[in-house]
Amino acid sequence: FWSTAPSTREIERADSLTGFDIVKYVINLEINPQTQFINGMVEAQVIPEWPLTSISYELEGDSLQVIQVLVNDAPAAFTHQNGVLEIPLPPALRTTFVTKVFYEGVPNRSPSPYNIGMIFTSSAVYTLSNPDAGRYYWPCYDHPWDKALVDWNIRVREDWLAAANGIRTGITDNGDGTRTHHWVSSSPVATYVMGFAAAPYVEFLQQAGDLPIQNFVLAGQLDNAQVDFANLPAMIDFFANLFGPYPFEKYGHMLVPMTTYAAMEHQTMTTFGSAYLSGDQEYESIVAHELAHQWYGNLVTPITMREVWLKESFATYSEFLWEARHAGWEAGCDYLRDEIQQYYISWENSNGPQTIFDPAYNMMFAPPTYEKSASVLHMLRLKLGNDAFFSFIRSIVNTFPGGNISTAEFIDQAEQAGGEDLSQFFQQWIYSPGIPSANFTVLQNSEGMARVIGTSVSPTSTMFDLDVPIRVPGSAVADSVVVRATPEGCTTYFSTGLVDNLSEIQIDPNHWVLARSFTQNRMQLAGCLAYDRAVDLSWTPFAADIPLAGYEVFRKQLPDGDFTCVTPAPLNALNYTDSSVANGNTYLYYVTAVDTEGYRSLPSNVMEAQPIEFLFDQGFLLVDETRGGSGTNISPSDEMVDDFYSYVLGDFSHTVWDLDEQGALSLGKLSHHPLILWHSDEFSNMQIIDNLDLLGSYVLSGGNLLISGWKYPSQFDPAFLNRFLPGVTPVQNNLAVLVSAQSDAYPDLHPDPAKLAAPWNGRLPMSYVFTGAADPLYRAEIFNAGPNDNEPLAIRVEAGGTMVLLGFPLYFMLGGEARDFLAQVIPELYPEVGTDDFLIPAPVLALSCAPNPFASALRISCQAARGGDRVELNIYSPRGQKGLALSGQAGPQGDCGFEWDGRDSAGRAVAEGIYLLEMRASG
């Protein structure tokens, strides 16, 4: 429970000069739950450490009136102002004395954000004092560094039970409809964990060995309580084995309908929120948390709330300890990751970096105190080792029982247990803000040695030195190797034994370290382009800042080959062409970096390639990825685009492939076409990004490619840019500023105003220029000679074949100019276009159909060259759009028949008209 609002109070610092020690309180309360009026008398036994002239208690709230004060049963003067009760003492008072303060009134609650003290509901009264709200309902020296015994005498209505610290010694019937409940503690208690609750309770008793467990619940809560607290005896035994024997005379719970906290660890008697009694042990972590406080917080208490993390770290960490014990180590690690580490990281993402030590008053009970500090304990356990860590946390209980501890004393105990200087560890985690990340470079040599370079990265000025466990593949121990990560980078060497591949190495698999992320510098194979008898590979530079000898490429032939290095020596380049491959085979590739000491990086990702033969035997292919718009000027329908390309291509013989209707293309399909015009005429839904490797392989194999469309350069990935456009930067002109495409070699191209939005004023938006390109076909004319004026607007790239990139969609240019441009550029790319195809010997095939024309069904007869040949039949519109594909197997005499009902592949009836049949047969 916390608030980021500015605190109106500061955490009080321990005052060693008070001159007195309160050894016992006797608190007598008469409570009227209807009027919320209380009568109280608090007796305090005080030992002066030197002669005192006065003593002060805190008692806040304007409606609480002090009636009388006695010192050693004699009336004494007093003042009660601004929440401080000041009592002058006889000048010669040097020995133990007793004060009695009589008071009455309606107690107030403490200010926001806590709003606690004595709390009344319709069916209960209870107290919450953490961090310093005892003073709002009884006069006390309300500071955690002065612990005292406490006896409670609580007078409430006769049908209620009252539960409190210590052992109940009796219940007195007052004969007036009330009873007084007497509770006596035998161990010193800090004021913030003194507390009681009263309600129409029933008692539910348990036993943990000789330890009595008293649970006070409402009758309707009993069944749920018996389930939710069923594991409490085992939990006490488990924590006793870890921390030391349970330290007090009893334990238990008192159920209350509180809304401030989930629960509160009052010494020997936890106050538990009714909302968290589910009957299915859903909130057992709260049970574990509050129980652990009996050792850390109650037996050993932070000297001030500046050190509040000392108690909440152990309680929160104990949630994980119990989960790991009860549900298994893996479940415990999941709990640690999700409910502690990630919970805190999410909180810090919203609230900013925080320091654990000395929080603001309003932030004492925020996640830095709980989840972050619990994470620190877990990392300390890793640093010290299991045996030393648990010895250390037991030493705290043994060294400071019944007393207080400071952060400095905690650190001193840890250093004694671990035998090392832990100043850096605690400086970065307790006294400084931030959560680090870390990056690791893992390398391995052929002699069975590994080298790990760890670098920590901090979002704040905190310099983090991290110990991070790793899991080595094949190791039986998950966290057997611990490496360091420092701001400047730290190198750790270790033997890998028989493990010859560290690819599956895991960084901190059991979540020991509170970190935003762990990353590894791994090689990234960015491109793997298969073409005719070769594979073109490209990769990104190795990110690690280490001296490199170069890069090595490894290849494996499927199905059962082994990876072998195909580069005779480390390469300095970021690409490699493997020409020692055969068409039709499938290969896998990865790349590694090699440093100057002979250590290899972990393998990159694996990519697959299958070189194939490029026959280029089927002429010009037009690929249409336009899905079709609304038919408005800037959103053309598919038919409008088809009509445009039918016009601008004129008499050029070509085949159409509609990606939206016919699906994805294969490299095998492209390998038959020496020229491809790929166009996209929509603002979005671009499909070219899924085909970059395909097109790259096509061009490298000698294919000729012309690309036209909106914004398609934005889809080019780094591998494509590096391979085909080195030194070229595509730059978008987002606004409607393109006036024309200008060229000395080709017809100028102007946007077609009829196809543009009126506000564009005849100018084209979202055009691209190619800064740095060396062979422009066109340059951009920009409105008012604005930015990117005269920059390359259409370029030619030579890479085995030729690629022509237009920084604009050809559809939106004037049709006549576009037609003239294509009439010139297409024969340059593919001189055979429009002439007879290559003369390729082929078997004699026969194809006939009847009736022709037909109304409902067409019988198609095919004659293959040989019996058993595979026969494919494709049906096209006159514009070359494939409507249907059929297949079958020829009979013994090579005959094969099909029937067509006039529907396309989607089952739609085709329009009346003339259709073309294409027959293909294997062999």
Language model: regions and residue ranges:
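Hydrophobic helix-coil surface modules that form long, contiguous segments used
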Residues: 40, 130-132, 140-288, 317
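Acidic/His/Gly-enriched intrinsically disordered linker/tail segments
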Residues: 312-379, 383, 400
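A glycine-rich, often tryptophan-bearing local segment used as a flexible ligand/cofactor-contacting loop or short
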Residues: 683-763, 770-773, 816-827
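Helical hinge/lid and interdomain linker segments adjacent to catalytic or ligand-binding clefts
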Residues: 279, 630-722
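Amphipathic alpha-helical substructures
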Residues: 50, 366-452
